[in-house]
């Protein structure tokens, strides 16, 4: 993966000045997307914003989170001509301000998701980026001597028309299987009293919940995976536009 991209994401999040060093433009000029367009196509948010990964970059003394990963994926996509929004609002602050607790996080993310959806009708894909709670072995795959964080798609089945979300998610997972079969743990459907069962996916057919790695995954492994997920998203949006 591109270390420069990862470092730029991390420095942006902690408020440091971004390096003036030129990062090579890796965008694909043959894409069907209009790279001059300012209309966003992808919205990335983190319902559980503080979920952490392991920092194996000693240069930076910080704990990377799923929010770090969201910003990295944004950079990957924008270098492919896909304008992307990452939700910057503080989920914990929303919970505190509204006397809610961590279990109510989907109420908070729903508020910002609805705002983004209403304010940006051009959006084609909504990604709630999480990480799982897994051992490093269970969350990791090595392919061609590169270590990747495995992914899992989650679909809630406790609302009407969830099948549309399931079909959409399975179509993305199929692209992963066709191109990077080693990466995916599949699509998990959740329902019942002990789970959320909706995950705000009732707001759009094009909302996916993506688990990238686990609590023992390194941010480098996550970045390696997101490089490939960026390609998957390019292919999916290309199908939609085609």
Regions found by a protein language model. Give the residues of each.
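Non-catalytic propeptide/linker segments at domain boundaries
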Residues: 1-46, 53-55
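Soluble periplasmic/extracytoplasmic beta-strand elements of cell-envelope proteins
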Residues: 41-46, 125-130, 152-154, 207-211
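Solvent-exposed loop/turn segments at secondary-structure junctions
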Residues: 49-52, 90-94, 131-136, 158-161, ...
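Second-shell loop/turn segments in exported
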Residues: 53-64, 73, 95-104, 154-163, ...
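Catalytic-core regions of hydrolytic enzymes
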Residues: 57-140
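A short, glycine/acidic-enriched catalytic loop
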Residues: 135-164
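Active-site-adjacent substrate-binding region
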Residues: 165-190
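Active-site-adjacent mobile loop/cap segments within catalytic or ligand-binding domains
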Residues: 186-242
């Amino acid at each position: 993966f591109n270390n420069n991209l990862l470092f730029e994401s991390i420095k942006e999040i902690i408020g440091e000045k971004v390096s003036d060093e030129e990062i090579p433009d890796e965008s694909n000029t043959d894409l069907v997307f209009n790279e001059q367009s300012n209309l966003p196509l992808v919205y990335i948010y983190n319902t559980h914003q503080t979920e952490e990964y392991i920092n194996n970059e000693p240069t930076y003394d910080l704990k990377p989170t799923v929010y770090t990963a969201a910003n990295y994926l944004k950079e990957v996509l924008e270098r492919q001509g896909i304008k992307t929004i990452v939700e910057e609002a503080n989920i914990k602050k929303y919970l505190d301000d509204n006397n809610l607790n961590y279990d109510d996080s989907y109420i908070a993310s729903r508020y910002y998701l609805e705002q983004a959806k209403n304010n940006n009708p051009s959006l084609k894909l909504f990604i709630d980026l999480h990480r799982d709670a897994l051992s490093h072995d269970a969350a990791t795959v090595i392919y061609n001597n590169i270590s990747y964080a495995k992914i899992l798609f989650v679909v809630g089945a406790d609302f009407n028309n969830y099948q549309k979300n399931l079909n959409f998610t399975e179509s993305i997972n199929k692209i992963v299987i066709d191109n990077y079969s080693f990466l995916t743990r599949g699509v998990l459907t959740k329902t019942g009293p002990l789970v959320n069962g909706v995950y705000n996916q009732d707001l759009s057919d094009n909302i996916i919940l993506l688990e990238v790695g686990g609590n023992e995954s390194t941010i480098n492994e996550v970045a390696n995976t997101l490089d490939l997920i960026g390609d998957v998203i390019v292919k999916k949006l290309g199908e939609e536009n085609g």
